[in-house]
Each structure stands twice: as structure tokens, then as C-alpha cells.
């Protein structure tokens, strides 16, 4: 038996509120991340990811409060990312109840941050989030044809995305969160070529993100090498349920958690 494929809803949180509107019935407060986390837990999510999109400094304290309240009521693993720049940031999030912390832009500026974090907190706690896209026309060519981006996909980091994922593994991260910026929001399916290339380059788990539009999009991502699949909008707006995604993955011959 292989390892079960994980299904992970992602919530964007701004100053303690869920951003991408959420369409659950019977929720007292659809903007409360804790309410949503509980609902996803009940619906069979294997893990949850919170992405803190708060620009302001004071937002950090609010996020810690959200993490604390979630950890009190939800017992599936919780990953938190967004604005993580230092050991202190990670320490605070883990103490508040996060199980894993994802690091993105700050590692591009200073890759050794990843090895410092994995040495101190353990590889299993540190996720490298990679916002990747095909190199656009006129962009700096990269060996794989894929580049790393920052600022929500608007700026090139002038790094090869596959090489960067590999470097992350060498520096000690336990998992890669692979976001396809080309796929993000399109609902046309995951970028399978990107997934296959990263899968061939690393041996740590890869979470596929960006592009899911329906349940049928998930099994090809798993076949391309994803150990976990992540989506936001389609879960929030009830376009697809977690049970439907797990059903599709199982029907394709892969193992899922009940």
C-alpha cells in the first residue's frame, strides 16, 4: 500500500478574516477562519493551510490568535504561511499551534534561512512554497522552462523553479508546496508538466496547488507525482466537496484517508 494522498483546503486570511468569500450554508460567520476550519475538518480534510495575506505588521498578532483558536478546536494538521521571515516568526506560529510553517519570498532572498529553520525546528515543520510559472516571452530563459515568481506571480525571481525546489530539499525542508501561477484561478486543471519535473527532481513530498476546477482534475495531479492536493476557491464555493475529490482519487486507483 502506498501512502494516502492528502486533500488540503487553503484559506487566505487578512487581518483575521477569510478573504476569498466562502459559501457554506449554516455558518454563523463565513469570514471566521476557525468556523471554516471546523467545517473542513468535519468534511474530511486531511490538513488545512492558512495563508496570511495581511500586509500590515499588526496583522501578525491577529494571525497568531486565529492559529490558537483553530488549534484548540481542530485536530488535523495546520500549515501557516505568509510573511514568515525569521526563526522567531516560526517559533511563534508553532507555539500558537501550527504544525508546519511555509516559507516563500524570504527564502529566495536568503536561502540559508531554510537550513536554519529545519535545524532548529525539524524538517517536518518546514514547507518551501514555490510560486512557479512558465518563463514568459522575453523572460530570462531557465533550463526547465519554469521560473520562480514573487509578489503573487507578478515578478520573476530569475530562478529556475525545478532547481529551487531541489535546493530547498538540500537545505532541509520537509515538503514542497508547488503553486502553478499559470494555473492559479483558471480551473483548467493542475500544471502536470511542472509537477512531473519537480517530482523527478526531489524525493520529499510535493503538494500540488493552482488550477483545480473539478474533481476530475485531481487524479492526474496525483499520477504526475503529487503526494497532496490543495485547492481554495472550489472548496469554499462548494463547487466540489472534499468527499468528491477523495472519491475521484480513489476511483483512479490511489489510496486516500477515509
Curated annotation (Swiss-Prot):
IGPS catalyzes the conversion of PRFAR and glutamine to IGP, AICAR and glutamate. The HisF subunit catalyzes the cyclization activity that produces IGP and AICAR from PRFAR using the ammonia provided by the HisH subunit. It comes from Corynebacterium glutamicum (strain ATCC 13032 / DSM 20300 / JCM 1318 / BCRC 11384 / CCUG 27702 / LMG 3730 / NBRC 12168 / NCIMB 10025 / NRRL B-2784 / 534). It comes from the Bacteria. One of its GO terms (biological process) is L-histidine biosynthetic process. GO terms for cellular component: cytoplasm. Heterodimer of HisH and HisF. Gene3D superfamilies: Aldolase class I (3.20.20.70). This is Imidazole glycerol phosphate synthase subunit HisF.
Amino acid at each position: 500500500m502506498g501512502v494516502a494522498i492528502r486533500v488540503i483546503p487553503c484559506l487566505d486570511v487578512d487581518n483575521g478574516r477569510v478573504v476569498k468569500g466562502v459559501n457554506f450554508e449554516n455558518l454563523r460567520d463565513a469570514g471566521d477562519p476557525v468556523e471554516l476550519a471546523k467545517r473542513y475538518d468535519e468534511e474530511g480534510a486531511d490538513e488545512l493551510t492558512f495563508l496570511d495575506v495581511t500586509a500590515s505588521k499588526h496583522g501578525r498578532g491577529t494571525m497568531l490568535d486565529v492559529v490558537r483558536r483553530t488549534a484548540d478546536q481542530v485536530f488535523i494538521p495546520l500549515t501557516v504561511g505568509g510573511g514568515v521571515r525569521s526563526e522567531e516568526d516560526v517559533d511563534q506560529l508553532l507555539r500558537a499551534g501550527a504544525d508546519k510553517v511555509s516559507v516563500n519570498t524570504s527564502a529566495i532572498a536568503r536561502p540559508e534561512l531554510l537550513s536554519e529553520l529545519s535545524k532548529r525546528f525539524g524538517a517536518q515543520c518546514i514547507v518551501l512554497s514555490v510560486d512557479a510559472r512558465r518563463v514568459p516571452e522575453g523572460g530570462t530563459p531557465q533550463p526547465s522552462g519554469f521560473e520562480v515568481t514573487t509578489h503573487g506571480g507578478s515578478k520573476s525571481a530569475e530562478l529556475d523553479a525545478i532547481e529551487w525546489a531541489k535546493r530547498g530539499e538540500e537545505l532541509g525542508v520537509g515538503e514542497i508546496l508547488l503553486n502553478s501561477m499559470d494555473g492559479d484561478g483558471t480551473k483548467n486543471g493542475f500544471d502536470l508538466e511542472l509537477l512531473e519535473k519537480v517530482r523527478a527532481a526531489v524525493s520529499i513530498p510535493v503538494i500540488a496547488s493552482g488550477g483545480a476546477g473539478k474533481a476530475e482534475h485531481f487524479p492526474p495531479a496525483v499520477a504526475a507525482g503529487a503526494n497532496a492536493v490543495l485547492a481554495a476557491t472550489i472548496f469554499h464555493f462548494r463547487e466540489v466537496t472534499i468527499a468528491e475529490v477523495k472519491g475521484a482519487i480513489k476511483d483512479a486507483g490511489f489510496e486516500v484517508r477515509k
